[in-house]
């Protein structure tokens, strides 16, 4: 599950909290950014900060980290029995240590703070990759990738009346096996089941490198900070435009474009945004508390339990 907790940029408004996205994958909780009121947003979705194992911060600006002091304080006051690891760009360690010291937070659980650059971190069934953006302070974009799986083609096996056999495990290792006098070639009797990939890009100027970084994403979460008519302001403040987002999505062969970090300046003129988006396909302007289910290879984007978008990345 992917929970879009906060979708605003710069400051909270009566419509949007600032950015945070929580992912619950195979029992691991991953929080991307911790905008103001992240805890409250989690509780509105019946989630708890105690479910967090990893926090990935894009950068140290307040609208992306002001929820962090409260999270650390809550974990210190609750029965949190996990190890928390916080990742972020250079400078994040000093900031977090000052937060802990300034708020006199008694950290009574294992806490690791890791400053990273462009890297790929393996978490077993998935990995998270990072790449630098261009902003007033060091900023990272992130990509979550569920590892592809080698699956046995049961339909083809059924044609040879082969249903189950311990030797079939060898096929997944790329080895030929002989069953009932029939030699099975792994190239013919196995296939790759694609893993989920999503990419988060926010608070950065456009970079050509983002296209390869986001390659074949099922979802791209991208900031909606400036329209094209305000491109000069976007460059001045080190942000991307709405056209930059579509360029990354289209040229990277990615699917669903979800806009987050929506600027308060456009809240009263959403009609202008929708005019631009009228002839575009596969996009959603996220709202707080939207969530994405991932079941049997199908992505289901929901708002208030209503399905807005459904897309199968593989079929069983």
UniProtKB/Swiss-Prot annotation:
Coiled-coil segments on the chain, per record: none
Role according to the record: Zinc phosphodiesterase, which displays some tRNA 3'-processing endonuclease activity. Probably involved in tRNA maturation, by removing a 3'-trailer from precursor tRNA.
Active site: residue positions: 63
Subunit structure of this chain's protein: Homodimer.
Signal sequence segment: none
Keywords: Endonuclease, Hydrolase, Metal-binding, Nuclease, tRNA processing, Zinc
Catalytic reaction(s) noted: Endonucleolytic cleavage of RNA, removing extra 3' nucleotides from tRNA precursor, generating 3' termini of tRNAs. A 3'-hydroxy group is left at the tRNA terminus and a 5'-phosphoryl group is left at the trailer molecule
Record organism: Nanoarchaeum equitans (strain Kin4-M)
Co-factor binding details: Binds 2 Zn(2+) ions.
Pfam families xref list: Lactamase_B
SUPFAM superfamilies attached to this UniProt entry: Metallo-hydrolase/oxidoreductase
Protein name: Ribonuclease Z
DNA-binding found in the keyword field: no
Matches recorded under InterPro entries: Metallo-B-lactamas, RibonucZ/Hydroxyglut_hydro, RNase_Z/BN
Family per record: Belongs to the RNase Z family.
